[in-house]
Each structure stands twice: as structure tokens, then as C-alpha cells.
Amino acid sequence: MALKPPSATQPAPNAPATPDAPPTTGDPGASAAPGSPTTTGGPGAPAEVPQEPQEPTQTPEELAFYAPNYLCLTIFAILLFPPFGLAALYFSYEGSWTQKPTSMLPPLQTMKANQNSEWEEAYINSGRTGWFGAFVVMIGLGIIYGLVLY
């Protein structure tokens, strides 16, 4: 029986894995260069490093449901009336008064809820941040207006 030549999709048995790689010999004890890591897969070879789990990707339909985070409005509220602006920043994520407040910024919490596809939480937090930020901006502008007039 005649031997068939290797097909175009199969590499030759002694061909290098890549065009730039040096040809390998059949001797598993020989190393390619001093100081280079061994990749023979033998018992003395280092274990492969496990890859980090990838974040789940979102479909275009899910990306369309992103809730706005009102980051500029929150920053504007802090600049116009810092006492309530900081309160808006701190308390806007709290669902009810029985929950303990968290120290993460509300716009960042909205972004995180958007990334985790927690739409209900993202929209509740987004609405709370927007309304409180708008309220604080109106108070700040009212105080400035009152100070300028009187």
C-alpha cells in the first residue's frame, strides 16, 4: 500500500507550529534555547494558567434598554447645592429607609445594573437619581436667585 502525502490542512510531522518557530526535534529532553520555558507538556512542564472568566456579552436588544445614569446632572447638583447634592449622591440608591445605604456612586450603580441586565433595579435607581438631582438643581438655583435679588 502506498503512503499518501500529508494534506494541505495537516502540517508535516516535523514542521514547526508557526513559520517563525524553530523546528522541533523528537528529543523531549532537549530545550530550544537556554532560559526559555518548556512547552512539551511533560510531567515537569508548568501547568497552564487558567483564563479569567469573560463577562457575559449583551445582545443589541439588551443594550437598547440601558437606563440613563444622569452623571452630569448629579455633578451639577453637587456644584450648585452641595448639602443636598451630596445627599442625592449618597441616598439615591437606597430603596427604602430600612435598607442600609451603600457608598457606591448611584450613577455607577446604574451602570453596574445595566451591565448585569438588572433592568428593574437600573430604571428605579436612574429615576431616583434624575428626580433628586433635578430637585437639588432647582433648590440651588433658587438660593442663588434669592441671594442675588436680596
From Swiss-Prot:
GO annotations of cellular component type: intracellular membrane-bounded organelle; membrane
Transmembrane region(s): 71-91, 130-150
Q: What is its main location?
A: membrane
| Keywords linked to the UniProt accession | Membrane, Transmembrane, Transmembrane helix
Q: Which InterPro entries match?
A: CD225/Dispanin_fam (IPR007593)
Entry annotated with the keyword Membrane:
yes
A Pfam family this chain is assigned to: CD225
Q: How does it sit in the membrane?
A: Multi-pass membrane protein
Give the start-end ranges of region Disordered: 1-61
Which segments show compositional bias classed as Pro residues? 13-22
Q: Where in the cell is it found?
A: Membrane
| UniProt KW Lipid biosynthesis keyword | no
Bias regions of kind Low complexity — which residues? 1-12, 23-61
Record's family? Belongs to the CD225/Dispanin family.
Q: What does this protein do?
A: May play a role in spermatozoa mobility.
The protein here is known as: Transmembrane protein PMIS2
Species assigned in the record: Homo sapiens
